[in-house]
């Protein structure tokens, strides 16, 4: 029978058994190596309230702590919530991570456009 993926959709490769984790969205049991894992860093306080808290704080320059959360999704929830996307047969063979999203002034910046702007700015300085 034909094989859809080289790794069979998991990262086990020779281990007999791996532990299970629960999906953060639907609580489905999914193998730890098959789960789509994401590490999120968020502020404990929403952005609208940060200034109010810093104004009311007794301590100057008080750093509000962040939430560090490791999220694990089952495959169906990850696809449904657009954490990962369905790729073509040729696209599935590409194992390189997708380009990092860059932000500038609160907006997403295309990496190719950002590199061109940096090169143009460097040429203007010389």
Swiss-Prot record:
Keywords: Ribonucleoprotein, Ribosomal protein. Residues 88-107 are annotated as: Disordered. This is Small ribosomal subunit protein eS26. It comes from the Eukaryota. One of its GO terms (cellular component) is cytosolic small ribosomal subunit. Pfam families: Ribosomal_S26e. Signal peptide: none annotated. Belongs to the eukaryotic ribosomal protein eS26 family. InterPro entries: Ribosomal_eS26 (IPR000892), Ribosomal_eS26_CS (IPR047864), Ribosomal_eS26_sf (IPR038551). One of its GO terms (biological process) is translation. GO terms for molecular function: mRNA binding; structural constituent of ribosome.
